[in-house]
UniProtKB/Swiss-Prot annotation:
Residues 220-252 are cytoplasmic. It comes from the Eukaryota. InterPro entries: CXCL16, CXCL16_dom. Coiled coil: none annotated. Residues 176-189 have a biased composition (Basic and acidic residues). Glycosylated. It is found in: Membrane. This is C-X-C motif chemokine 16. Residues 26-198 are extracellular. Residues 115-145, 163-195 are annotated as: Disordered. Pfam families: CXCL16. GO terms for biological process: positive regulation of cell growth; positive regulation of cell migration; receptor-mediated endocytosis; response to tumor necrosis factor; response to type II interferon; T cell chemotaxis.
Length: 252
């Protein structure tokens, strides 16, 4: 009876140990409404290059149970809600100093020359050449909010293929930097993932050894009690006395 209770207790403890160690990284508690592609540990915060990448490409962030998820164009990055770099990034995004969702502040002044309407004799190549030397940052800033009276002039003077060229050039320049920062994120996350995967296995093995020792102790104690209650010499003497009594009764 005692052995059966001990076995049930062992099974319950093993189930509790497995349930407590099953959540690892993005799994367990972080699977649901806040999935994370990369999780940054509190012991190894991102370096300055990664922080610069996060400030530049941050689109939005979401407060989860015990961490914050930052949404980037390609992936999501999560960190503890009490970490310093997380608080800094949220404050930067809320104040409008970083991120795609906030308006950009352009330091260079806007110099725009009102060009006259082209005549039939003057070709439009001269006006097109003057627009080509404008910086791509100013062109991107002017496209969403054009100045009053200049919309018709831009549509006549700026070809569509030039705007596309500047946009694609900016994307090609930002792509190597994004790949390099993602590679650094993976390198920082590698040793941490190996350590976090080893700790649950060691704790589970320790629990199994402890429970096996408890079970062995209970079995040995039970056998000892049985030997004390029925010693071998006393049982043999009782058997001899019973045989003598039967022999005497048969003789009588």
């Amino acid at each position: 009876m005692m052995l059966g209770r001990t076995s049930r207790l062992l099974l319950v403890l093993l189930f509790i140990a497995y349930a407590t160690t099953s959540g690892n990284g993005n799994e367990g508690s972080k699977v649901g409404s806040c999935p994370c592609d990369h999780t940054v540990s509190s012991h190894s915060p991102p370096n300055e290059n990664i922080m610069r990448h996060l400030r530049k490409y941050l689109k939005a962030y979401q407060r989860c149970f015990s961490y914050v998820r930052f949404q980037l164009p390609l992936k999501n990055v999560c960190g503890g809600s009490t970490d310093g770099w997380v608080q800094e990034l949220m404050h930067c995004f809320d104040s409008g100093e970083c991120g795609h969702a906030q308006p950009r502040v352009v330091d260079a002044p806007l110099h725009r020359t009102q060009l006259p309407e082209p005549t039939e004799a003057a070709p439009s190549d001269t006006a097109t050449t003057s627009q080509t030397y404008l910086p791509s940052t100013l062109q991107r800033t002017q496209q969403p909010t054009p100045l009053e009276g200049a919309l018709s002039l831009d549509s006549k003077l700026i070809p569509t293929h030039e705007t596309t060229t500047y946009t694609s050039g900016h994307s090609l320049g930002a792509e190597p930097e994004a790949k390099e920062n993602q590679k650094q994120l993976k390198e920082n996350r590698g040793p941490q993932a190996g350590t976090s995967a080893t700790v649950p296995v060691l704790s589970l093995l320790a629990i199994v050894f402890i429970l096996a020792g408890v079970l062995l102790y209970v079995v040995c104690k039970r056998r000892k009690n049985q030997l004390l209650q029925h010693p071998p010499d006393l049982a043999a003497s009782l058997y001899t006395c019973s045989r003598r009594t039967r022999a005497e009764n048969g003789t009588l």
